[in-house]
Design a protein with these regions (language model features):
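Residue-level recognition of beta-strand termini and adjacent short loop/turns
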Residues: 191, 197-223
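Tryptophan-anchored aromatic micro-motifs
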Residues: 174-191
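A short beta-strand micro-motif common to beta-rich folds, especially ectodomain repeats
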Residues: 126-128, 139-150
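C-terminal motif of bacterial Sec signal peptides marking the signal peptidase cleavage site
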Residues: 16-19
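Sec-dependent signal peptide recognition
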Residues: 4-11
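Beta-sandwich strand segments
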Residues: 151-164
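Acidic/polar, low-complexity intrinsically disordered N-terminal segments immediately downstream
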Residues: 21-112, 117, 121-123, 135-141, ...
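Conserved small/polar residues in nucleotide/adenosyl-binding loops
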Residues: 228-229
């Protein structure tokens, strides 16, 4: 009796799995277009500092869905002038000195804002060239991008919040930048013999062969941090 019940259960499961497979193969799922970047936050993009040369970056765009993209899509990308302001206020409120700043247009170039994704493909790359010469790298610079929507377009951007935009925090590096262990560095505050110990310090790029870091035990969120570089 038990063997019959087990056999019947296995047959039922096979029928259910077969039905599910047929259901998904015929599923009419909307193919939403989005950036492949972390959502609800800025995406830190680390790029090699190149003196007198652009620093290239390729941002992926993807077509979401449980079935393969079956049509040619031309995705229209633009500069998002609103989301960064909202993000800054939601995360830092009145601390405007901590705000990310929008990267001026003379420090980047985008060869083509229209990205083609052919049928049978679910991803394409958007080329961006950054130029750091003359940029104040003590600030946090962000390039905010958005996927445009219009009834005339043959695609729909992802409806979930933050999926159709990307906040690219541009962080250049050179051969000397990065995190350094500083446990041997003792900082003595005024009127005390007890040292303040900082475990690590991050060194930031100035140019191809130069770095800077904040002196002593200065925290990067202090309002006067620029005066102690």
């Amino acid at each position: 009796m038990k063997k019959k019940n087990i056999s019947l259960l296995l047959v039922t499961l096979l029928v259910m799995l077969s039905s599910c497979s047929e259901f998904y193969s015929d599923e009419q799922y909307e193919h939403y277009v989005s950036f492949k970047a972390p959502t609800s936050t800025v995406s830190r993009i680390r790029l090699k500092y190149r003196k007198g040369q652009p620093s290239p970056y390729r941002l992926p765009l993807i077509v979401a869905g449980s079935t393969m993209n079956n049509k040619d899509i031309d995705v229209h990308v633009g500069i998002d002038n609103d989301t960064l302001d909202i993000y800054n206020y939601e995360h830092y409120y009145e601390r405007e000195d901590l705000y990310y700043k929008q990267l001026p247009e003379n420090f980047y170039s985008i060869p083509n804002y229209d990205i083609h994704i052919p049928a049978g493909e679910c991803q394409a790359l958007m080329d961006i060239n950054f130029n750091f010469n003359g940029l104040d790298l003590s600030e946090k610079w962000v390039l905010p991008l958005i996927i445009k929507d219009d009834p005339s377009y043959n695609y729909t951007s992802h409806p979930r919040k933050n999926f159709n935009n990307a906040l690219l925090w541009i962080t250049p590096f050179n051969d000397f930048s990065g995190n350094y262990g500083t446990t041997a560095l003792n900082v003595f505050p005024e009127d005390t013999n007890k040292p303040l110990v900082v475990d690590t310090r991050e060194a930031y790029v100035v140019d191809e062969n130069t770095i800077f870091f904040y002196a002593g035990a200065i925290k990067e969120k202090r309002t006067d941090r620029k005066s102690v570089v």
